[in-house]
From Swiss-Prot:
Localisation per UniProt entry: Membrane
Membrane-crossing residue ranges in chain numbering: 243-263
Domain notes: The RING-type zinc finger domain mediates binding to an E2 ubiquitin-conjugating enzyme.
Membrane topology: Single-pass membrane protein
Gene Ontology MF terms: polysaccharide binding; transferase activity; zinc ion binding
Organism of provenance: Arabidopsis thaliana
Zinc finger residue ranges, RING-type: 320-362
Name of the protein: Putative RING-H2 finger protein ATL21C
Length: 366
């Protein structure tokens, strides 16, 4: 019998007692017992579930700014977090409109609170437009100007002089769309919410920090899930907490010890071999999930050299959704099978070698 098997019941028992101790301590969940974590003096407080939770990726930048990392869209500046309503406001001060063209919250625990459908257009600069049609400066260039509106009728009225680049859903802060072109899209925040884990039924305080938060490290703080302290100390009644503790210790004696003895008698070789087999079976799936396409497969996708008109089939616009540059004549574009979305060859080839799916609709190309 190995030393680890002999040690396991003792460690299990200690962890159980420690859990009871933290569950019966009402100060562990008190937001006033310690100062909340922050990236900087004026930044938002960091509390559960943004403390040491795998899917809530909150970081500090070198400038002590709080940023949220979304798996499919990158990092965004955090403007505010409403813990009671479980909402977070994010923004990109550089060019939010550009980030929206490829915005995707797949793989994250967040969802839009208000979902507004916006239309993005590109108009040649030689087209004379009214002065009250504000363009988006960070997307515009010397040859064309970009516009955005949630009024689709207004967008259609600008055709055929202008081209619709993309229509997409924006997680807005208000359920009401605009009747004109958006003049401050870059100054707005995106409003996201999360349903699980539900922090509203728990206290909001974080009790412990490891690492140095002001050196751009990831947050790590503890939070007790085992019990709510209010269940153990109702109206200051200490006897109920003691009663729960006594019952729990009795349960340890009756149920936990026999279980530990059974585990110690379990065949270690069968246990280890089962774990090894599970590990071997799991590794190929993880590798395959991260694998892109090889060049020979990518070359089988249809290519086309653009003519002077630069016209493309289907819903494809005149702008490459990856690099956001307008297509030029004599350039070569590649089409994705099934969805028929197209991109610059040099843009989509690099993407497919990493992701193996369409950047717009996420359909698998394998």
């Amino acid at each position: 019998m190995t030393f680890s098997k002999q040690l396991f019941p003792f460690v299990f028992f200690l962890l159980f007692l420690v859990s009871l101790r933290h569950a019966s301590n009402p100060n562990n969940c008190s937001s006033s017992s310690s100062r909340p974590l922050r990236c900087g003096p004026l930044e938002v407080p960091i509390r559960f579930p943004f403390c040491n939770h795998a899917r809530f990726n909150l970081h500090c930048t070198d400038l002590n700014k709080t940023v949220l990392e979304l798996p499919m869209s990158g990092t965004f500046l955090v403007r505010d977090i409403d813990y009671r309503r479980q909402k977070i406001y994010i923004n990109d001060p550089n060019c939010l409109a550009k980030r929206l063209l490829t915005f995707n919250i797949s793989g994250s625990p967040f969802s839009p609170h208000f979902d507004i459908l916006y239309t993005f257009l590109s108009c040649p600069n030689e087209v004379v437009l009214p002065s009250w049609y504000p363009s988006i400066p960070c997307l515009s260039n010397s040859t064309s100007s970009f516009f955005a509106t949630s009024n689709y009728s207004l967008a259609q009225s600008m055709l055929p002089s202008c081209q619709i680049v993309k229509r997409l859903h924006v997680p807005a802060t208000s359920p009401f769309g605009e009747t004109r072109f958006s003049s401050d899209l870059n100054n707005q925040s995106l409003l996201l919410e999360w349903a699980l884990p539900d922090c509203r039924a728990k206290c909001l305080g974080a009790t412990k920090k490891t690492g140095t938060i002001y050196n751009s490290n990831i947050f790590s703080c503890s939070f007790s899930f085992l019990y709510d302290s209010r269940e153990l100390f109702i109206n200051g009644n200490l006897s109920s907490g003691v009663l729960v503790l006594v019952i729990s210790l009795s349960a340890v004696t009756v149920f936990v010890f026999p279980t530990c003895i059974a585990i110690r008698l379990y065949d270690s070789e069968r246990f280890d071999s089962a774990i090894a087999a599970a590990t071997v079976m799991q590794q190929p799936r993880e590798v395959m999930a991260r694998r892109g396409l090889d060049q020979s497969t990518i070359e089988t996708f249809k290519k086309m050299e653009l003519g002077e008109s630069r016209r493309l089939s289907g819903t494809n616009g005149i702008v490459c959704p990856i690099c956001l540059s307008e297509y030029a004549s004599k350039e070569t574009v590649r089409f994705i099978p099934e969805c028929d979305h197209c991109f610059h060859v040099e843009c989509i080839d690099v993407w497919l070698k990493i992701h193996g799916s369409c950047p717009l609709c996420r359909n698998s190309c394998a």
